A protein has these predicted regions:
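Conserved HGGG/HGGXW glycine-rich cap/lid loop of the alpha/beta-hydrolase fold
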Residues: 3-49
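Active-site loop/oxyanion-hole signature of alpha/beta-hydrolase fold enzymes
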Residues: 41-82, 98
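Active-site acidic short loop of glycosyltransferases
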Residues: 6-8, 35, 75-77, 99-100
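Conserved catalytic-core motifs of eukaryotic protein kinase domains, centered on the activation segment
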Residues: 23-25, 50-56, 117-118
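Stable alpha-helical elements in mature extracytoplasmic
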Residues: 25, 29, 62-66, 87
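Conserved hydrolase catalytic core segment
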Residues: 77-120
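Flexible "cap/lid" subdomain of the alpha/beta-hydrolase fold that forms the substrate-access gate
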Residues: 104-168
Length: 168
């Protein structure tokens, strides 16, 4: 969990799939908000600077891990959740299961359950992308690692290099 800022309200950023480093990906947004809010960016297992684990990744497990990470970091609710993409499901579940911990949800291109009901995921294409990344093939695709985080100009040169290393 990365934190900055000293405001009365705590914004908790939750990443979606394909976010290689939430701390760096969300920096261009939270750096604009940290003068007025306390910021907490949760890097779930397998993302960015967190550990990779071989455990079940169901919504109950992920929510439990997120809540525990915030607790261990000494960050108390209620929270304003800022979920991106598939973390929208976690945020909605959190608000339903622990309403006293969630003050509000501000979706960042947030997915909702109906989206997943209608979405048809191609498992072979998904697996191909995973294998390509694991083998380093994605390094050869021009501009793939040049995300908005890099283009926004809020990352230092060192952070850009870290981002690229984590991305690949």
């Amino acid at each position: 969990v990365y934190t900055e800022g000293e405001g009365d309200k705590t914004l908790v950023f939750l990443s979606g799939g394909g976010t290689c480093s939430p701390i760096l990906d969300f920096k261009s947004l939270y750096s604009l908000l940290s003068n007025e809010y306390k910021i907490a960016v949760v890097e779930k297992f397998g993302y960015g600077f967190s550990d990779v684990v071989d455990e079940q990744r169901d919504i109950d497990t992920m929510l439990s891990e997120t809540r525990m990470a915030l607790e261990k970091a000494g960050i108390e609710g209620p929270y304003v959740l800022c979920p991106h993409s598939m973390s929208g499901l976690e945020a909605l579940y959190w608000a339903q299961k622990y309403p006293e911990e969630v003050e509000a949800i501000i979706g960042l291109d947030m997915a909702v359950p109906a989206y997943y009901d209608e979405m048809h995921i191609s498992i072979p294409i998904t697996k191909l992308g995973q294998y390509g990344a694991a083998l380093g093939i994605t390094r050869w695709i021009p501009g793939l690692a040049e995300s908005d985080a890099i283009k926004a100009g809020t990352l230092s040169e060192e952070e850009k290099e870290i981002y690229r290393a984590v991305f690949y």
